[in-house]
Amino acid sequence: MSEFKNVTAVKKANVYFDGNVTSRTIIFEDGERKTLGIMLPGDYEFGTGDKEAMEILGGSMDVKLPGSDKFVTYKEGDTFMVPANSKFSLIVKEVADYCCSYIKE
């Protein structure tokens, strides 16, 4: 899906790592929440509350998921899942565009 309709966009940006990772939150009529963001090159670690589906819309990133000791490359068109209440690491070598979906379990 290349666009979302009938959503509320939160004006204030989510800014992480001194502005190297930014996103905007959108909320659907049913309460579902997603963020649309950009990551500049760098090494990052994020923690999750909810389960997350990370869809790569542009660029690529190397991802180390919980329970793994190696990085796997995800590129445009790929999606990876991150368990709730966990941490994952990223190595971004080029600007990456992403959509993160938060999944209530």
Curated annotation (Swiss-Prot):
GO molecular function: guanosine phosphorylase activity; purine-nucleoside phosphorylase activity; thymidine phosphorylase activity; uridine phosphorylase activity
Keywords of this entry: Glycosyltransferase, Transferase
Tagged with keyword Phosphoprotein: no
Entry's EC annotation: 2.4.2.1, 2.4.2.2
CDD domains: cupin_PpnP-like (cd20296)
Disulfide cross-links: none
SUPFAM superfamilies xref list: RmlC-like cupins
Coiled coil: none
This protein's record includes keyword Glycosyltransferase: yes
Catalytic activity: a purine D-ribonucleoside + phosphate = a purine nucleobase + alpha-D-ribose 1-phosphate; adenosine + phosphate = alpha-D-ribose 1-phosphate + adenine; cytidine + phosphate = cytosine + alpha-D-ribose 1-phosphate; guanosine + phosphate = alpha-D-ribose 1-phosphate + guanine
InterPro entries, A to Z: Ppnp, RmlC-like_jellyroll, RmlC_Cupin_sf
Gene3D superfamilies in UniProt: Jelly Rolls
HAMAP family found in the cross-reference section: Nucleos_phosphorylase_PpnP
Protein name: Pyrimidine/purine nucleoside phosphorylase
Encoding gene per record: ppnP
